[in-house]
A protein has these predicted regions:
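Bacterial N-terminal signal peptides
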Residues: 1-7
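A well-ordered secondary-structure block
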Residues: 73-153
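Short domain-boundary/entry signatures in modular proteins, especially
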Residues: 151-161
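Asparagine-centered strand-capping/turn motif at beta-strand->loop junctions
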Residues: 160-171
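Intrinsically disordered, low-complexity Pro/Gly/Ser/Thr-rich segments with frequent PxxP/GP/PP motifs
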Residues: 178-196
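A short, solvent-exposed beta-strand micro-motif common in secreted/extracellular proteins
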Residues: 194-206
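Extracellular beta-sheet/turn segments enriched in Thr/Pro/Gly and aliphatic residues
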Residues: 206-234
Length: 234
């Protein structure tokens, strides 16, 4: 008489909703940035495209690195139509035979980046204004495999330009993001910064400012500094 073994039903692996995972990653990243008094990131479709193309490449089993396939984050966002002056990229891979619930996968990805000093620094990049995210799923050998690419960037067109004019009779000394400059009397100089500008006047003219685009700073005859609204230099 044949002996029949009991049939054990194997639970199907959980399947995370990819679109929801991506949205949750952005939401969690913005909450993390807000807790450090940093601006929220706006999702950009070109950055999404660059992230998705690279995540799909990694999911083929290619080398898991930022230069996989002989490209760099800067090259990839450029090919997607994004002219960047700041680019940071985070990669992560999570896999399990049991799969992941939607919130679980999003939470796991974000926590992995927070726990890594380099990735954490990227998440808190102060000069980034936009983001792209892609999570690509690959099922193989009984494994639910997820590849995530996060991009944080700032467009070249978002560069801040500002002018400094020296209307005094003495040379004016100042620093822009730590770099020192000297401006002779009756001269002007235009600066452009992709990163958030930090303007520090030293010597007779003193004051610290965070210039906005197209603002003008004038060193007056008495050494004081006048800040003028965009277009204020004429």
């Amino acid at each position: 008489m044949a002996c029949l073994a009991p049939i054990v039903a194997l639970a199907a692996p959980q399947r995370a909703n990819i679109e929801s995972v991506e949205s949750l990653v952005i939401e969690s990243t913005n909450e993390f940035r807000a807790s450090h008094n940093l601006s929220r990131l706006t999702r950009n479709p070109q950055l999404d495209l660059a992230a998705r193309n690279f995540a799909a490449h990694l999911a083929t089993g290619a080398a898991f690195s930022h230069e996989s396939g002989g490209t760099t984050p800067e090259i990839r966002v450029f090919r997607a139509g994004y002219q960047a002056c700041v680019v940071a990229e985070n990669l992560e891979r999570q896999y399990s035979s049991a799969g992941f619930a939607t919130h679980e996968l999003a939470r796991t990805l974000v926590q992995a980046w927070k726990d890594s000093p380099g990735h954490r620094k990227n998440m808190l990049e102060p000069d980034a204004l936009e983001t792209g995210i892609a999570v690509v799923h690959r099922a193989h050998d009984g494994i639910e495999d997820f590849y995530a690419v996060q991009l944080l960037a700032r467009k070249e067109s978002q560069t801040v330009y500002f002018m400094i004019r020296n209307g005094s009779e003495l040379a004016a000394t100042y620093r822009v993001n730590g770099k020192q400059f000297t401006l002779n009397p009756n001269y002007g100089r235009k600066h452009g910064r992709c990163s958030t500008p930090d303007l520090l006047f030293e010597g007779r003219a003193r004051g610290r400012f965070e210039p906005k685009n197209d603002e003008c700073f004038i060193v007056e005859k008495d050494g004081s500094v006048t800040r003028r609204e965009p277009g204020g230099c004429g």
